[in-house]
């Protein structure tokens, strides 16, 4: 499980989108078009300048298990009340139930964006020379 607290560390910023367009204008324009709603949403509701990239991080973890780290724990999903749909993680083993999930708690945004850009732009990592500066901003 990769929760929103972790995926929210992966933000496709306007600078990253511009860099993507410079490397491959067609793909960059497409990615900008499909993320525009989210760029606007995150700014309007949270004042985040960029698009939080949730699902691609979960997929990237399966391609590179070093992308994220975490712990094995028992996880249950609340099915009623105000917390309906929330994941309840017993990280301390309080309920003494067998772990049924890997809960990812850390990620490496630079490692993610190297893979993300490399795969969607079909470029080798060495061609992504400015990426580190843009991700660490």
Each model region followed by its residue ranges:
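N-terminal acidic, glycine/proline-rich low-complexity segments
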Residues: 1-137
